[in-house]
């Protein structure tokens, strides 16, 4: 009987948590996923004044061939209002009472692109930067008034933190959790030692044309 009671409580808490999550759309008409559809992101609010923002990772497209090999789900907006809330670090911050924002990765460009390319004659949007700018703009007042503000990302999302450091640094005392290399001088020295497999081409993609806003923010 006690077990059933505890299970009911757990289910009630889970339902309440999921009910608070909202699927939001970007407002800028250029803040789109690679397939050209308006990007979406997830906001799960609590009664706290603390905010946790998670940049999703998942590789990158360094050429038309590598883009075509990526899953279709990585090129379009999510329609799931609970998307990304299952990630362990996201769940952890939710348990701590933080408001949570999940930025899905649908542009294959390390959350930093602002250009288009033709792939098999079709326009493909690499507008990750535009998506991040739009989301930050929509949540700007929340971030400015946050008691604690934490940004995190994994893999491509972690590198995306570095590419968007100029946006992050605008807020008071932001904290950053990066689980892999971001693009600072020290990590670049290490990456340039990787000369086997796809790393030569990947590094060329990463470092060939660094955005001006990436310089000097850490």
Summary of predicted features, one role per range:
Residues 2-10:
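Sec-dependent signal peptide recognition
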Residues 11-19:
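Hydrophobic h-region of N-terminal signal peptides that target proteins for export
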Residues 19-50:
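A domain-start/cap signature at the N-terminus of enzymes
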Residues 44-138:
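Active-site machinery of serine-nucleophile hydrolases
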Residues 60-62, 109-110, 158-160, 183-186:
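Flexible loop/turn segments at secondary-structure boundaries
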Residues 103, 149-154:
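Short glycine-rich or small-residue beta-strand-to-loop segments that form or flank ligand, phosphate
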Residues 116-117, 123-150, 165-218:
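Surface cap/lid and interfacial helix-loop subdomains adjacent to catalytic sites
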